[in-house]
Amino acid sequence: MNPFAKVLLCTTSLLAAIVVLPSAIFAWVDPTTVYARAWAILAAEPYVKQGFHMHEDYWCGDLASGKKKAVRQQLFKGNEYWFWLGTEVDHAKVSVHIYNSDGELAEQRDSWAKDHLAAAHIIPKTTGSYFIIVSVEESPAARTHWALAYGFR
């Protein structure tokens, strides 16, 4: 390869790396999703101390006040699960409930909701698909970002 072609190839490769890599390395993340997830993790903290293993994956989105979102999850008999919901919006009220595949409420009585945090507890009687219903009951924001995390033991 002649010297000019080598320099041109190296320069082009370097320029491509400068243009492409920063966008891959510094991908933009919506800060409201990060804050909502931080609140969900905060709700999970006491349960993690009790031996629940928190999954790294989570669900997130935004909802208008009074709207709901269903998330389907495979749960296994013999395990115990907590689902933690959080939002960064002050004065928002959120809730989370768990239903079995027949549409019956399946969560334990110790599930709770307080302001912009909520949690639902389930000990599945059977292995199968369950539906976790996330709801923004009320919010001062037009759209309320939320994040749902879960753990098991």
Regions found by a protein language model. Give the residues of each.
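Bacterial N-terminal signal peptides
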Residues: 10-24
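Extended, low-complexity, turn-rich repeat/linker tracts enriched in Gly/Pro/Ser/Thr and Asp/Glu
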Residues: 87-94, 139-141
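C-terminal edge strands of extracellular/lumenal beta-sandwich accessory domains
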Residues: 28-48, 52, 98, 129-153
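Short, surface-exposed beta-strand/strand-loop-strand elements in extracellular ectodomains
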Residues: 90-105
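Extracellular beta-rich ligand/substrate-recognition surface
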Residues: 57-67, 111-112
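Exposed aromatic-hydrophobic patches
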Residues: 71-72, 117-123
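Surface-exposed loop/edge segments in extracytoplasmic proteins
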Residues: 55-58, 102-109
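Hydrophobic beta-strand segments within beta-rich accessory/binding domains
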Residues: 70-87, 131-134
